[in-house]
């Protein structure tokens, strides 16, 4: 058992998660689009410290848009093009911002899993602050798993950029979620 660092305190949290998708599935091609936003704020009220902040502070600030177009070569394999944009919304929008554009292949071994492998991908990095970020050519690998079991929704998305120029320019994002649908599209997660 560990005691907390500020024993005479209370914490409040508030968060909003929005996941939207629009898919077009045809016999010869598919087009999958997704938008994900995860925002949360937290407030620590230390009763022993009169100088602590009265405001909620940003705890999570994630914004992601992606679009995948594929032309089916077989039932589970397609030639594809992929675009993905990642940044924050509340603090430092587009600083940094990451835009990936690439071509390659998409494998769907079963309906709940999509694996994107694009050996020709350019990772554009935007930054207006003094931080040093570099755009570069590389490979993009994305694995997206979604499963619904009754009202329980499980999801995991791994997005990896591997720079051909320097491993320091590589980056990844791994997002997992678990939610429960209460009524129609309203849920807890």
Explain the meaning of each model-derived region.
Residues 98, 102-163:
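Detector for outer-membrane/organellar transmembrane beta-barrel domains
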Residues 28-31, 76-79, 111-115, 146-155, ...:
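Repeated loop/turn-to-beta-strand initiation elements of outer-membrane beta-barrel proteins
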Residues 1, 26-28, 37-43, 83-89, ...:
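Transmembrane beta-strands of outer-membrane beta-barrel pores
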Residues 43-100:
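Hydrophobic/aromatic-rich structural module bridging two neighboring secondary-structure elements via a short loop
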Residues 135, 148-189:
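Outer membrane beta-barrel transmembrane domains
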Residues 1-16, 45-55:
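Surface-exposed strand-loop-strand hairpins of Gram-negative outer-membrane beta-barrel proteins
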Residues 10-16, 59-63, 95-101, 131-139, ...:
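Residues that define the transmembrane beta-barrel architecture of outer-membrane proteins
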Residues 16-24, 67-71, 85, 103-107, ...:
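Residues on the lipid-exposed face of transmembrane beta-strands in outer-membrane beta-barrel proteins
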């Amino acid at each position: 058992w560990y005691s907390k660092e500020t024993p005479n305190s209370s914490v409040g949290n508030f968060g909003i998660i929005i996941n939207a998708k629009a898919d077009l599935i045809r016999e010869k091609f598919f087009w999958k689009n997704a938008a994900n936003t995860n925002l949360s704020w937290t407030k620590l009220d230390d009763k022993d410290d009169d100088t602590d902040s009265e405001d909620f502070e940003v705890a999570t600030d994630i914004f992601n848009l992606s679009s995948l177009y594929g032309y089916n070569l077989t039932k589970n394999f397609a030639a594809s093009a992929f675009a993905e944009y990642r940044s924050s919304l509340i603090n430092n929008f587009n600083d940094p911002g990451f835009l990936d554009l690439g071509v390659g292949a998409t494998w769907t071994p079963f309906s709940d899993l999509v694996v994107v492998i694009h050996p020709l991908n350019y990772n554009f990095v935007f930054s207006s602050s003094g931080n040093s970020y570099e755009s570069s050519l590389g490979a993009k690998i994305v694995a997206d798993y979604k499963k619904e079991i009754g009202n329980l929704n499980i999801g995991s998305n791994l997005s990896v950029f591997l720079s051909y120029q320097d491993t320091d320019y590589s980056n990844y994002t791994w997002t997992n979620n678990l939610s429960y649908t209460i009524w129609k599209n309203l849920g807890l997660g």
